[in-house]
């Protein structure tokens, strides 16, 4: 045995389940599109829109009303069921029509066409008079039925209102426009002057920066000249050094092969690049020290074979 309001409760449960399904569909669509969202924000937005559409379209009241009729029939109250006996003739056709009506109502509500606009459009129609700018407002059968049922009220506040004709003071309007123009002109001049000051300051900064760059370039040029002078001086010194060593070598009574070897090492010194020249000088000095060391060892061995002793220093 069903309770008194079991069908009505089932209808409310179906509406709530539809709302939850709408929330899940909205969040799933956002996730599939890769859009980040706030669940509470989506929930509140869908709830507000869902409640408005269901209430404004009359779908919620329609479903609950039918559920109440079924509950009354189940509880042996057949008055409402008898009034809707036409629904018992063929349930498939009324169900489809009712579904289409509810769908259209919700679609109109979602597009911003609310209940007031739908009722007014259903109660009135406008007929244009050919050749005139005026028109005739016609009442539909729905409006006539509402008048017969006493569902139309007259708001006297709109009837008693007096129409006031405003007189335009063109002089004051012109003065207002002139003040607005002067205010706009002063703001434009102020912005232009500020822009000129900024441009002038920027130009001064640019000239100052150009002067600094010019000074730095001049200083770099001086350093380059000084560096070239030092490089030439080093080249001359290296050339003089090699010439002096060659002259001194020729004055020595050494074996020609030794002289040729030393001259070859001296001629290998790079007189163009001072850095390479110092490396070459280091190599020549190392070779001379090595030759001197070998000569000393040979002389030491010769003295020892002759049973002589040697010592360093002066007595």
Swiss-Prot record:
Gene3D superfamilies found in the cross-reference section: 3.30.70.1610, Nonstructural RNA-binding protein, Rotavirus non-structural protein NSP3, N-terminal domain
Residue segments, region Interaction with host EIF4G1: 208-315
UniProt xrefs under Pfam families: Rota_NSP3 (PF01665)
Subcellular location: Host cytoplasm
SUPFAM superfamilies, sorted: NSP3 homodimer, Rotavirus nonstructural proteins
Region (RNA-binding): 1-149
InterPro entries: NSP3_N_rotavirus (IPR042519), NSP3_sf (IPR036082), Rotavirus_NSP3 (IPR002873)
GO cellular component, one term: host cell cytoplasm
Residue ranges the record marks as coiled coil: 166-237
Protein task: Plays an important role in stimulating the translation of viral mRNAs. These mRNAs are capped but not polyadenylated, instead terminating in a conserved sequence 'GACC' at the 3' that is recognized by NSP3, which competes with host PABPC1 for EIF4G1 binding. The interaction between NSP3 and host EIF4G1 stabilizes the EIF4E-EIF4G1 interaction, thereby facilitating the initiation of capped mRNA translation.
Family, as annotated: Belongs to the rotavirus NSP3 family.
Name assigned to this protein: Non-structural protein 3
Taxonomic source organism: Rotavirus A (strain RVA/SA11-4F/G3P6[1])
């Amino acid at each position: 045995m069903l309770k008194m309001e079991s069908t009505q409760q089932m209808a409310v449960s179906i509406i709530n389940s539809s709302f939850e399904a709408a929330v899940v569909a909205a969040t799933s669509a956002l996730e599939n599109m890769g859009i980040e969202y706030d669940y509470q924000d989506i929930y509140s937005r869908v709830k507000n829109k869902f409640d408005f559409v269901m209430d404004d379209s009359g779908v919620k009241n329609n479903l609950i009303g039918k559920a109440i009729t079924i509950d009354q029939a189940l509880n042996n109250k057949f008055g409402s069921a008898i009034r809707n006996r036409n629904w018992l003739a063929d349930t498939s056709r009324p169900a489809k029509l009712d579904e289409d009506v509810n769908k259209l109502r919700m679609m109109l509500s979602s597009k911003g066409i609310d209940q007031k606009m739908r009722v007014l459009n259903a109660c009135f129609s406008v007929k244009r008079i050919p050749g005139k700018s005026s028109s005739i407002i016609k009442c539909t059968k729905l409006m006539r039925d509402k008048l017969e049922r006493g569902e139309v009220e007259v708001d006297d506040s709109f009837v008693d209102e007096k129409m006031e004709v405003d007189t335009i003071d063109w002089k004051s309007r012109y003065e207002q426009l002139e003040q607005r123009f002067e205010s706009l002109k002063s703001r434009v001049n102020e912005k232009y002057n500020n822009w000129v000051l900024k441009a002038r300051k920027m130009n001064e900064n640019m000239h100052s920066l150009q002067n600094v760059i010019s000074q730095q370039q001049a200083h770099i040029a001086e350093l380059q000249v000084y560096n070239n002078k030092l490089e030439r001086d080093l080249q001359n010194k290296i050339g003089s050094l090699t010439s002096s060593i060659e002259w001194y070598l020729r004055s020595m009574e050494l074996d020609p092969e030794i002289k040729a070897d030393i001259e070859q090492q001296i001629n290998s010194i790079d007189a163009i690049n001072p850095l390479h020249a110092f490396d070459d000088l280091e190599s020549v000095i190392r070779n001379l020290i090595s030759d001197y060391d070998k000569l000393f060892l040979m002389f030491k061995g010769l003295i020892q074979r002759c049973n002589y002793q040697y010592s360093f220093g002066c007595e």
